[in-house]
């Protein structure tokens, strides 16, 4: 032991520093190695403090004969000389075979190397501007872009989690269904802040059974490849574990259920939201995050961007934003109707509302169906449709007067007359004058003579 101490203490700080190697594992995660000394240090969970300090978690391991294993782990501002000096002193107390001055030189070199790389950020790259095939790169068309975040928000019990689990199963199977296109099987990590594995396991099993993928042709159970992670800390504290799972399993899609629970701060605080987006961008995977509306959004049951709970930077940071609106008029206990409303789109055209119907038997989910605008127009889901689609839904079964169409839309005849006239000019509707001079509007196929004994209709 004494010989080892003598040999080590003969090594100058300069020699140890020259032996130093810094490795960037990923954004904000580094590893420093001193081969001669047998010391390895990890630096991660880096944050910018309000006072401009950079704070990080430092973990030092030793492979030396004395004190082998973990030496010390702490979180300090790595821009503070006092903190670095104190950390080096603590390391010397753990392994005195390395002089205090040598420990200080090692920690200084580690922190300086990390700070330089952290501050310079990503290198600039030249934009050629010569791309001929300009298109949106979808992971899940038309919902989630490649390596970009999508938020689906809706009130509690609207069916957000069930929809996310349905999408996750489609990804796992590489299955296109109900207008959701997935070209090949994808690896999914479901990060759950809201429930537990038992409930999520049951829900995934229900969805897989409804889609016919729970069993093979011989009736044998077929397991999914979906990864589940129970999270009970803010995203900043869960990020390292999530990243390890992403790397280990080659994850393509990260599902966050839900944003409010994952934030670990005030959703109205722009600094909290911006830090959240920065953390998610480090994962470099596509993200489907579930969120909730604000109080006004819950009262109105609408899905515009102003209904999303929290800071406007939440909307600014997302690429695709969808509101999930649940019908409040559905009387049948075995059905839930919901509509996805495209509220924000950066690089794509706005999608038409996508309606879904969850059909349940007495104990479980039985089917997931797509519903068209005409069906949505028959319930309170019509509020998410354009005036064009609401009018078409109102006259889908029979021609109606302007007042009758307006009543269907909870408007007055005066409010929609210009839209009716526009649709007649475009050929989407026909104007029909009855024998008693009432003006009615219908679909083109309705501009025909009625049954014998009825009014004679004249198409204008």
Segment roles from a protein language model:
Residues 32, 45-46, 183-267, 271, ...:
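Conserved inter-motif catalytic segment of the P-loop NTP-binding fold
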Residues 130-137, 236-237, 302-305:
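Short gly/ser/thr-rich secondary-structure transition/capping motifs
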Residues 1-39, 247-248, 330-460:
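C-terminal regions of RecA-like/P-loop NTPase motor modules
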Residues 151-152, 157, 161-162, 191, ...:
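Phosphate-binding/switch region of NTP-binding enzymes
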Residues 180-183, 246-248, 280-283, 315:
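Conserved catalytic network of the ASCE P-loop NTPase/AAA+ motor domain
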Residues 1-116, 460:
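N-terminal nucleic-acid engagement/recognition segments and initiation subdomains in replication
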Residues 110-207, 214:
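The Walker A/P-loop phosphate-binding site
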Residues 104-122, 363-375:
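Short, structured interface segments
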């Amino acid at each position: 032991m004494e010989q080892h101490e003598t040999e080590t203490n003969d090594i100058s700080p300069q020699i140890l520093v020259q032996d130093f190697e810094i490795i960037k594992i990923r954004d904000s995660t580094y590893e420093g190695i001193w081969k001669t000394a047998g010391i390895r240090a990890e630096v991660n969970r880096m944050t910018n403090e309000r006072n401009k300090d950079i704070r990080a978690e430092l973990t030092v391991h030793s492979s030396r004969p004395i004190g082998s294993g973990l030496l010390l782990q702490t979180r300090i501002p790595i821009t503070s000389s006092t903190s670095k000096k104190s950390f080096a002193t603590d390391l010397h107390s753990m392994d005195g075979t390395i002089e205090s001055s040598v420990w200080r030189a090692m920690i200084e070199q580690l922190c300086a190397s990390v700070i330089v790389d952290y501050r310079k950020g990503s290198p600039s790259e030249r934009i050629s501007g010569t791309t001929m095939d300009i298109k949106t790169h979808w992971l899940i068309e038309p919902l989630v872009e490649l390596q970009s975040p999508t938020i689906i928000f809706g009130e509690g019990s609207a069916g957000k989690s069930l929809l996310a689990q349905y999408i996750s199963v489609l990804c796992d199977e590489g299955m296109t269904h109900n207008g959701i296109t997935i070209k090949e099987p994808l690896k999914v990590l479901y990060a759950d802040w809201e429930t537990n594995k038992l409930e999520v396991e049951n829900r995934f099993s229900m969805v897989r059974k409804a889609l016919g993928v729970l069993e093979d042709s011989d009736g044998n159970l077929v397991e999914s490849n979906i990864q589940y992670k129970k999270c009970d800390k803010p995203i900043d504290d869960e990020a390292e574990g999530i990243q390890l799972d992403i790397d280990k399993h080659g994850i393509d899609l990260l599902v966050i259920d839900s944003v409010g629970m994952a934030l670990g701060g005030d959703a109205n605080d722009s600094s909290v939201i911006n830090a959240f987006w920065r953390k998610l961008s480090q994962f470099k995977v596509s993200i489907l995050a579930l969120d909730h509306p604000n109080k006004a959004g819950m009262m109105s049951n609408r899905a515009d961007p102003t209904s999303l709970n929290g800071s406007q930077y939440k909307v600014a940071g997302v690429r695709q934003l969808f509101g999930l609106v649940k019908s409040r008029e559905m009387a049948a206990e075995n059905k839930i109707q919901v509509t996805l409303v495209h509220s924000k789109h950066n690089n794509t055209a706005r999608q038409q509302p996508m309606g879904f119907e969850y059909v349940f038997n007495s104990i479980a989910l039985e089917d997931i169906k797509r519903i068209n605008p005409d069906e949505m127009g028959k319930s309170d889901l019509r509020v998410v449709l354009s005036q064009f689609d609401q009018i078409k839904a109102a006259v889908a079964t029979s021609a109606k007067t302007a007042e009758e169409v307006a009543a269907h839309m909870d408007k007055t005849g005066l409010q929609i007359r210009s839209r009716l006239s526009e649709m007649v000019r475009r050929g989407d509707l026909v104007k029909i004058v009855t024998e008693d001079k009432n003006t009615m509007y219908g679909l083109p196929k309705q501009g025909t003579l009625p049954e014998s004994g009825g009014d004679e209709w004249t198409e204008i």
